[in-house]
C-alpha cells in the first residue's frame, strides 16, 4: 500500500481501518447470523 507513504498519520489510519475490517470479518466468520442482521 503506497498510501502509507503519503503522511505520518495516514498509515495509522489505514491500519485502524484494516483492524476494524478484520474484526468485522471475524465476527461474520464465527457468527454470520449477527453479521447479516445489521
From Swiss-Prot:
Strongly inhibits juvenile hormone biosynthesis. Belongs to the allatostatin family. It is found in: Secreted. It comes from the Eukaryota. This is Allatostatin-C. It comes from Agrotis ipsilon (Black cutworm moth). In its non-pyroglutamate form, expressed in antennal lobe (AL), corpora cardiaca (CC), corpora allata (CA) and gnathal ganglion (GNG) with expression in AL detected in most animals and expression in CC, CA and GNG detected in few animals (at protein level). In its pyroglutamate form, expressed in antennal lobe (AL), corpora cardiaca (CC) and corpora allata (CA) with expression detected in few animals (at protein level). Not expressed in GNG (protein level). The modification Pyrrolidone carboxylic acid is found at residue 22. Keywords: Cleavage on pair of basic residues, Neuropeptide, Pyrrolidone carboxylic acid, Secreted. One of its GO terms (cellular component) is extracellular region. The lineage of its organism: Eukaryota, Metazoa, Ecdysozoa, Arthropoda, Hexapoda. The keyword DNA damage does not apply.
Amino acid at each position: 500500500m503506497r498510501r502509507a507513504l503519503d503522511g505520518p498519520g495516514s498509515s495509522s489510519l489505514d491500519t485502524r481501518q484494516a483492524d476494524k475490517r478484520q474484526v468485522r470479518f471475524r465476527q461474520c466468520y464465527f457468527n454470520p447470523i449477527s453479521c447479516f442482521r445489521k
